């Protein structure tokens, strides 16, 4: 079996970089997602009047699950193939967030979701191809 980049000395740095980005994304999306789930509906729709509270709660669920998907599979060493899928799902969320932010606030408002989406895309590709996470048996899926 050929070694993946994550198993080489050069790949160790990539592995740690990906983990750092995964933890940061997890914290960001867990915070954003949980806030959308626990805030009262009136507060939730104050800033974003174009979306219903139910839709924003759905986005909160997606963000929370995506945040968990960034770290739990790697920490538990099970279903590690879910991490790049979670990151790819968060890229889709950030594409939508970029469009909404651009419409509401212009280019300055769209910068944060663009950068977040790029980081999530890097994690998705990195964990899919460059340095996949091994499962408990050491197998890379």
Whereabouts are the PLM-identified features?
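Membrane-interface extramembranous regions
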Residues: 2-141
